[in-house]
Regions:
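Short, flexible active-site-proximal loops enriched in glycine and acidic residues
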Residues: 88-100, 272
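Glycine/charged-rich beta-loop-alpha catalytic/anionic-binding loops adjacent to active sites
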Residues: 61-74, 102, 196-200, 267
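Glycine-rich anion-binding loops of enzyme active sites
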Residues: 49, 53, 62-63, 81-82, ...
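Glycine-/charge-enriched secondary-structure boundary and capping motifs
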Residues: 2-7, 24, 113-131, 142-147, ...
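Acidic-glycine-rich active-site phosphate/pyrophosphate-binding loop
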Residues: 52-57, 61-63, 191, 253-263
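N-terminal glycine-rich phosphate/pyrophosphate-binding loops that anchor nucleotide-derived ligands
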Residues: 1-91, 129, 133, 169, ...
C-alpha cells in the first residue's frame, strides 16, 4: 500500500535538494538597471526591475494530472491548469498577469490533442485576462511518451505595490479561499489510489481555480500584507509569506470529499495529506485585523468561497487544527 508521496515516486525533500543544486550554479546571471533582480524571500514569482515597476515571471507545468486527464478524456480543460499554476503565483507578489506562453512536448503530432490543449489554454487566459502571445511545440519521441505541457506567465507591478511579506505582523487575519479540488498537485499519488469511479474522477480533474480577478479586486480595496498559493508542499507554502512568524489555522475550510476518500483509500497520515495536497485551501491572504470584514465582502462578491481560517502569531512554523 502506498502511503506517502515519496513511496509513489515523488520525494519532496530530494526535489528541494536538487533544485538547490541548480540554483547554486546561477551566480553572475544578473544585470544592472532594467532587468536587475528584486530580492524576495521565498517569493512565488521572480521579479526584475522595469522602469518604475517590476516584471514578475513564473514558469510551471501541470505534472502527472495530464495522465489522469488523458485516462478520463478530460484534456480540454488541462490548459486551464497550466495557466492557473502560473498566474496564481504571479498575483502573490501583487503583479497583474499580462501575457502567457506555452510549451508542448509530444511523441508525435496530434491535431486532436493540440486542439484540446488550445481550448483550455485559451479559457485559462480569458479567466486571468491575460494575452496568450506565443508558444513552442516540440516533437521529441526519444524524450517524451505521449505529451507534456508547461507555460510561463509575465506580469507587472508598480514598485511600491510589490507584496513581499515584509508587512506581515503578529495578529494579522488569515483568509482562506476554497480550492476546486487537488488543483495540479499530488497526482502521482492520486493515480496510485484512483479506482476509476466517475464521480470521484470528475472531482479529481476539475481545473485549478484561477484567483486573479478576485485578488486584483481585493488589492484595490484592502491593504493586503501577503498571499500564499497553496500548491506542492501544502501548508508549508504559508511560510513563504514570511518565515519569521507562526501561522495558526484553527478554523479551516471544509475538506472536500475527494481528499477524505484519498486518505481512507491510502491509509495516509494526516501530516502527509497536508504536506502533499491543498486539502480544500487554494489561496491564503494575510490582512490587518480590522480589514477582514471588508476583504471577505470583496472576495465573496467576486464569487469566492472565503472565510477567516486563522491568524498570524509570534513564533515559527504552521499550526493546523487537524494536525493537533
Amino acid at each position: 500500500m502506498v502511503r506517502t508521496y515519496a513511496e509513489a515516486g515523488v520525494d519532496i525533500d530530494a526535489s528541494d535538494r536538487a533544485t538547490a543544486a541548480l540554483v547554486a550554479q546561477l551566480g553572475g546571471t544578473t544585470r544592472e538597471g532594467d532587468g536587475m533582480p528584486i530580492a524576495m524571500e521565498n517569493g512565488f514569482a521572480g521579479l526584475v526591475r522595469l522602469g518604475d515597476g517590476a516584471l514578475a515571471v513564473c514558469t510551471d507545468g501541470v505534472g502527472t494530472k495530464l495522465l489522469l486527464a488523458r485516462e478520463l478524456d478530460s484534456l480540454d480543460t488541462i490548459g486551464v491548469d497550466c495557466v492557473a499554476m502560473n498566474v496564481n503565483d504571479l498575483i502573490c507578489v501583487g503583479a497583474e498577469p499580462l501575457t502567457f506562453v506555452d510549451y508542448v512536448a509530444l511523441d508525435k503530432p496530434d491535431d486532436v490533442l493540440m486542439a484540446q490543449l488550445g481550448a483550455g489554454l485559451a479559457e485559462g487566459c480569458r479567466l486571468a485576462n491575460c494575452t496568450l502571445s506565443g508558444g513552442e511545440t516540440a516533437v521529441v519521441p526519444e524524450l517524451v511518451r505521449d505529451f507534456d505541457l508547461a507555460g510561463t506567465a509575465v506580469g507587472w507591478v508598480a514598485r511600491g505595490d510589490i507584496i513581499d511579506g515584509s508587512r506581515v505582523a503578529d495578529g494579522d487575519a488569515l483568509i482562506g479561499l476554497a480550492s476546486s479540488g487537488p488543483h495540479s498537485n499530488g497526482y502521482t499519488l492520486i493515480r496510485r489510489l484512483f479506482n476509476n469511479d466517475p464521480v470521484l474522477g470528475a472531482q479529481l480533474v476539475a481545473p485549478t481555480r484561477i484567483y486573479v480577478q478576485s485578488v486584483l479586486a481585493l488589492l484595490g480595496a484592502v491593504d493586503v500584507h501577503a498571499l500564499a498559493h497553496i500548491t506542492g508542499g501544502g501548508l508549508e507554502n504559508l511560510l513563504r509569506m514570511n518565515s519569521s512568524f507562526r501561522y495558526v489555522v484553527n478554523n479551516p475550510l471544509p475538506v472536500p470529499e475527494a481528499f477524505d476518500w484519498l486518505q481512507r483509500k491510502g491509509d495516509i497520515a494526516p501530516t502527509e495529506m497536508y504536506r502533499t495536497f491543498n486539502m480544500g485551501l487554494g489561496m491564503v491572504i494575510a490582512v490587518a485585523t480590522g480589514d477582514e470584514a471588508r476583504a471577505l465582502e470583496v472576495l465573496k462578491h467576486a464569487g469566492e468561497t472565503a472565510q477567516i481560517i486563522g491568524c498570524v502569531a509570534a513564533g515559527k512554523g504552521v499550526m493546523h487544527a487537524a494536525l493537533e
